[in-house]
Amino acid sequence: MANIKISTSLGDITVRLYDDTPIHRDNFLKLASGGYYNGTLFHRVIRDFMIQGGDPDSKGAPAGKQLGVGGPDYTLQAEIKPHLFHKRGALCAARLGDEVNPNRESSGSQFYIVWGSVYNPSQLKQMEKQMKQNQVAVTFNDLVSYHKEEIMNMRRNRNRAGLQAMQEQLLKEAEDICKANPAGFTEEQVQAYTTVGGTPHLDGQYTVFGEVTDGLDVVEKIQGVKTLRGDRPCDDVKVIAMTVEA
């Protein structure tokens, strides 16, 4: 596993990159060692949530400039792994939303580090319930898309009985699929979210490709800075340099 020291204007953060996400690991190593991030800002900071950086357009950006859309001319294939989750200190890849990015491909350069909150078990159970409902809905919509032509033919022929039967069939299929592989939190996730904290609602949505091993106090300091509209810090928080360590 590679380690990278992120030297910022508020202190140093060391992250370890996971070997389980080789596409993101190799890309981050390439950009960091090539000086790509030097001089960029943590342009989006939300207290009790996360700090985001990696936009090359943030280098020397004047106050008030809207940031967050810059990056290289490529995206990265998602490497979303169930055992890599959004605990406090997780290093993750930013991306565009599902409506324009259904495959959840990552930004070529933008990343965020999780701060989040500590949850109690009842909060996680409620969240888990919502996750299961969402899982059924997403699976049902996927099945509808798969049977789109058949459904369109029924609509053209005004076959209401057939449409009703198809809906019931696909809903049952979706429920059966989800029962076989239910959404929820592992013991490791529950332990992390009820002790150190994090952002559990992002699990399964974004690629987590590393974690902070030193300098979590610096992350805390950055996530607590005052911000302007658009979540940009009032006073720039700059990445001075990134150094690849053994």
Regions found by a protein language model. Name each.
Residues 1-246:
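Cyclophilin-like peptidyl-prolyl cis-trans isomerases
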